[in-house]
Swiss-Prot record:
Keyword annotations from UniProtKB, A to Z: Activator, DNA-binding, Nucleus, Transcription, Transcription regulation
PROSITE patterns referenced in this protein's UniProt entry, alphabetically: BZIP, BZIP_BASIC
Protein function: Binds to the cAMP response element and activates transcription.
Family recorded in the similarity comment: Belongs to the bZIP family.
Species in which this protein is naturally found: Mus musculus
Protein name (Swiss-Prot/TrEMBL): Cyclic AMP-responsive element-binding protein 5
Self-association state and partner proteins as the record states: Binds DNA as a homodimer or as a heterodimer with JUN or ATF2/CREBP1.
Amino acid sequence: MSMRPVPGSLSSLLHLHNRQRQPMPASMPGTLPNPTMPGSSAVLMPMERQMSVNSSIMGMQGPNLSNPCASPQVQPMHSEAKMRLKAALTHHPAAMSNGNMSTIGHMMEMMGSRQDQTPHHHLHSHPHQHQTLPPHHPYPHQHQHPAHHPHPQPHHQQNHPHHHSHSHLHAHPAHHQTSPHPPLHTGNQAQVSPATQQMQPTQTIQPPQPTGGRRRRVVDEDPDERRRKFLERNRAAATRCRQKRKVWVMSLEKKAEELTQTNMQLQNEVSMLKNEVAQLKQLLLTHKDCPITAMQKESQGYLSPESSPPASPVPACSQQQVIQHNTITTSSSVSEVVGSSTLSQLTTHRTDLNPIL
C-alpha cells in the first residue's frame, strides 16, 4: 500500500485516538498545507476546527472514564463524534484520495475498537493502561514521517512541533494516567471501608446480643430458681439427716434400755447375794459357842489327841474368812458359785450335825 502525504486533520485524528481519556493540550500545533493537494488548506481548516471541537469534547469526557458509572454516557458521545466525522468526510470527497480514505477508515475502525475496549478497560487494573497505550504512539509517528520526507524544508519546520507535541503527550498522559487512578483506588477504598466498617460492627454486635439476652435471662431467673432449688436441696438434705439421726438415736435408746435392764438384773442379784451372806454370818455367829462344836473338837481329838483340839477351830475360821472374801470381791457368777458352795457346805454340815443331835 503506497503511503501518501497525510494532511493535518489525520494528525488531529491520531491525537484524538490517543487522547480519548485525556484533555486536549492548550495549544494544538499548526499544520502546513500540502502543496501536492490543491485546495487542501481551504478544505482542511474547517475539518481541523471540527476535529478540535470533537477532540476537546472527548477530552473533557476523558477524565470521567475512570469512573465506571459514567461509561454509558461517554459511549453516545463517541458515537456522535464518529457520526460527525463521517458527515464531514462525505461533504468533502474531493479533498481526500483513496489512500487517505483507507487510512481514515482504518482509524475509524481503531476508534470503534477503542470504544469497544473502553468498558473492558475499566475492569482492568492500572498496569493494563500502561501496556495498551504505548503501542499506539509509534503508529502515528510512522505515518507522519513518510509524509514529510519529500519536503525537507517543511519537515524541519514541522518536526519541532511534532516532537513538542509528542513530548507534551508523553508528559501529559503520565500526569493524566496517574492522577485519575489514585482517586479511583481511594474511592474504592472509601467505598469498601464504610462497607467493611458497617459489616464489622454488625458482626461484633450480633454475637453479644444473644449472650447478653441469655445473661439477662439468667440474672432474672436466678434469684427465684436458685432459691427454690436451694430450698429443695436443703430440705432433702435435712430430711435425710433427720432420718439418720432418728435411726441412730433409736438404736442408742434400744442399747441403753438393754443395758439398763441388765444393770437392774445384776443389781438385784447383788442384793440377793448380800442378803445370803448376812444370813450365813448370823448362822455362824449363833453356832460359835454351840456344844456341837465342842463335840466335834473332841471327836477330832480322839483321832489326833495332840493336834486335834487346837486345830479344830482353825478350819472353821479359815472357811468363814474365805467365804466372806469371796462374797465381797467376786462378781455375780462367782458369788453364785460361792453361795452354792457355802450352801452345800452348810447342808453337809447340817447333815453331819443332825445324826449327832
